[in-house]
């Protein structure tokens, strides 16, 4: 039972890690269709893509504030590049920390396989999963708050061409990954409790067996010992308690 739960946690952690990685690698965190220029515009944490009227799909990316910090890019001619904001880059870096904690939880599982009697690897795995889930949920909430602000909610093409952005499939993929992390945390806590209970049961059985063995060897007759020492031990043995005499009451 405990081993099955442990492998279920492993599978859920891998699924959550891959879902979060897929969300980070795709640009559809905010999506808008600009009818004036007939383009779908997708804005991610580090990647922004748009479709041209001729069907061409072009993307721009940023890893620093100096890459694309203006609304138009002089380096790319002929099409508009969505602006990147510092909070997007910050959330991306924080998300990478969450993924690092998920990797540490997987490493803790590998350690727990080789040290089955130790509780520490499983406890560390639970702690790393909690940290990964908390950071993931925090980033999702922060993105929802920022994307709802007026400054980052609309895509401006012209004075009259203002279009509202909506959360895209990348955000929902990341949300699914965060909930899978949450399920893995619940199973991880259950696994730690099961391991603690099994450990206590094993220790109690060992104590009982050692006590019985010590009592057996204490009163066992050894032919190498003298008869007098055996008789002395037999005479000094603990006697059972005297049974109580029940008073009989006669009813007339």
UniProtKB/Swiss-Prot annotation:
Gene3D superfamilies assigned: 1.20.140.150
Membrane topology annotation: Multi-pass membrane protein
One BP annotation, GO: epithelial cell-cell adhesion
UniProt keywords, alphabetically: Membrane, Transmembrane, Transmembrane helix
Positions of transmembrane segments: 7-29, 91-111, 127-147, 173-193
One Gene Ontology term, aspect cellular component: plasma membrane
Family: Belongs to the Clc family.
The name this protein goes by in its record: Clc-like protein 2
UniProt gene name: clc-2
